[in-house]
Amino acid sequence: MEIAGNSSTISPTFSTPTKKRNLVFPNSPITPLHQQALLGRNGRSSKRCSPKSSFIRNSPKIDVVNTDWSIPLCGSPRNKSRPASRSDRFIPSRPNTANAFVNSISSDVPFDYSESVAEACGFDLNTRVLAFKLDAPEAKKPVDLRTQHNRPQRPVVTPAKRRFNTTPERVLDAPGIIDDYYLNLLDWSNLNVVAVALERNVYVWNADSGSVSALAETDESTYVASVKWSHDGSFLSVGLGNGLVDIYDVESQTKLRTMAGHQARVGCLSWNRHVLSSGSRSGAIHHHDVRIANHQIGTLQGHSSEVCGLAWRSDGLQLASGGNDNVVQIWDARSSIPKFTKTNHNAAVKAVAWCPWQSNLLATGGGTMDKQIHFWNAATGARVNTVDAGSQVTSLIWSPHSKEIMSTHGFPDNNLSIWSYSSSGLTKQVDIPAHDTRVLYSALSPDGRILSTAASDENLKFWRVYDGDHVKRPIPITKTPSSSITIR
């Protein structure tokens, strides 16, 4: 590059002046390239050679050359005074007026805020995006996109937790009810009528209409010790304290006949079609055929003390009895000798119940000194389950709707319990404080929803133990079996 008015040549990289001269530029327009070079020189430090000379020595720098030769590939050089427009891969060009707004958005985010966002999202800022990682675990089931697409968009429904009613649905007065563990003074018929004995009187309460009527009254010398409905609910048998057994027609409210044979009170009764079995304090069990005049057709001698629990199996093939001698006897219908004798209880056995959904399964419960509930296989005689109830067992009732059993208790808890039964054991579902005194008597409604309990606190309470999904449609009741019975 040559300077005007001089033939000497200046190296583009470095030069040293030899003579004192003034640099004079002709009056010609300054090109943008030359202007940038001058601006670069003005920004550098200057040094005077001597006081006698007015020449200012400027040492050319290599960055001046760099600045001079920073020429764009095409077009005119960019004017530094005009701000460059910003662009990115999504917006090729932006108006210059929006630069301030864009700069504020694209400015660096504070590190604390980025760290907080990363922590909330669950990833580490120091982790590389493309770093080597282990593969994600495979799904247990292959994902079928068609199945996922066709699946109905329904919320996941969890089964509702079962709720138990811990308060009675209805409470009736039962004044004068006898406080005796060995008696059975409450029963519920298949026609939805409740019978309860209060000292010398028998009352019936219609659960449909709510009406109450007095059915029977005994002599002053005796009292009512037990009541039991026939299968169709047409007849009510009443055991007395003097050893007699009366049979009443509920519809006409008349006594049909009185059957003798026992020498002591009759504390328990059980029907098997036209045969009525009665257990007495003497330990004897009598079978009565109510169709004939000579009603006593059999006697069972298997207990040395009072018989307080008696129950026929639903098919009528076996009879179970429990006594104050702590013994459970299982009898075949055609034999007077017990098939199985169980002595596992340590107290009187009043609670005896056959399972409705497994005909050969028998449950028995012991008194205050025992507090055990045993389950027996009546076909083999084996004990299949045992549970400690924690208090005196006064009655056992199987649920017709599910594999559950209800138990009522005396000392010390006086409660109503519901158990879930399985072959591996029992699980208590709920304990309901039922009465202020021991719960002596209980009966289940024909639809299996409501359990009635009675105690010496002179209250008759009704508990809704099953409802909703736990209840199936009740089996219709027909009068065919008992309607053909002619009681003489």
Swiss-Prot record:
Region called Disordered, residue ranges: 1-29, 74-93
Origin, by domain of life?
Eukaryota
Q: Name one Pfam family in it.
A: WD40_CDC20-Fz
One GO cellular component term: kinetochore
* Residue ranges, compositional bias (Low complexity): 7-17
One annotated GO molecular function is:
ubiquitin ligase activator activity
Instruction: Reply yes or no: does the keyword Cell cycle apply.
Output: yes
**WD repeats mapped onto the chain:** 178-215, 219-258, 261-298, 302-341, 344-386, 388-429, 434-473
Tell me a GO biological process for this protein.
positive regulation of anaphase-promoting complex-dependent catabolic process
UniProt-listed InterPro entries = Cdc20/Fizzy, WD40/YVTN_repeat-like_dom_sf, WD40_CDC20-Fz, WD40_repeat_CS, WD40_repeat_dom_sf, WD40_rpt
What keywords are annotated for this sequence in UniProt? Cell cycle, Cell division, Mitosis, Repeat, WD repeat
PANTHER family noted in UniProt: CELL DIVISION CYCLE 20 CDC20 FIZZY -RELATED (PTHR19918), FI02843P (PTHR19918:SF8)
What role does this protein play?
Required for mad2-dependent spindle checkpoint activation. Promotes ubiquitin-dependent degradation of cdc13 by the anaphase promoting complex/cyclosome (APC/C).
Q: Which family does it belong to?
A: Belongs to the WD repeat CDC20/Fizzy family.
What do we know about how this protein assembles, alone or with others?
Answer: Interacts with cdc13, mad3 and mes1.
**Protein name per Swiss-Prot or TrEMBL:** WD repeat-containing protein slp1
Encoded by which gene?
A: slp1
